Amino acid sequence: MANNKSSKKRVQIAERNRLENKSYKSAMRTLMKRCFSACSHYSQQPGETAKANVKASIDSAFSKIDKAVKRGVLHRNTAAHQKSRLSAAVKQAIEPAPST
């Protein structure tokens, strides 16, 4: 437990930052899930509106991930990994591999 005033304040600040980071990560994960679900919806029912939905969802997810790195919530390599997963899912949905 903290013994002096400055360390008590640091504990409070760390808890505040933890909660802010938690909500930011949660919002980021939600946008990623929306992107994955938009991809699966497009795979089942392709169309221009579904394709626009996929594009909009990946753009918003990428934006949130980049802002998380900028704010120090995520490490840049973790962000790159998440963006790579999203890109691969979108590519797979829009341009499926030819079956041979």
Swiss-Prot record:
This is Small ribosomal subunit protein bS20. GO terms for biological process: translation. Belongs to the bacterial ribosomal protein bS20 family. NCBIfam families: S20. Gene3D superfamilies: Ribosomal protein S20 (1.20.58.110). Keywords: Ribonucleoprotein, Ribosomal protein, RNA-binding, rRNA-binding. It comes from the Bacteria. Binds directly to 16S ribosomal RNA. One of its GO terms (molecular function) is small ribosomal subunit rRNA binding. InterPro entries: Ribosomal_bS20, Ribosomal_bS20_sf. Residues 79-100 are annotated as: Disordered. GO terms for cellular component: cytosol; small ribosomal subunit.
